[in-house]
Amino acid sequence: MLNAKNRLRKRKEFGYIYKKGTKIYGQHLCIFFVPSKISAPKIGISVANKVGHAVVRNKLKRQIRHIMREFVPAIKNINLVIMIYPEIVGTTYENLKQNIQKTLQKGKIISE
């Protein structure tokens, strides 16, 4: 689970990142990010209603929060939103982790 200081919660924050942020496309996901004035990164997760039932969506969000917890120390001064596409349903945890890591590296959010 992400710490409270590392979570995006407000609709206004999500909207700002969608509007002003840079997009990075990965396999089955898209990451929007903007530079932040605060040193601690803030992370939001967006899973559309088209992605399975509520149980499936919540499981994906829990897995992504757990994965991002490992990457938080490497991320500096960035707020980001991870948007999940419906095709991701059925992928393994390890595959999801690799997809997120590759996408973060592609956008130079974390180093390789």
Q: What positions do the PLM features span?
A:
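Positively charged, solvent-exposed patches that mediate nucleic-acid binding
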Residues: 1-112
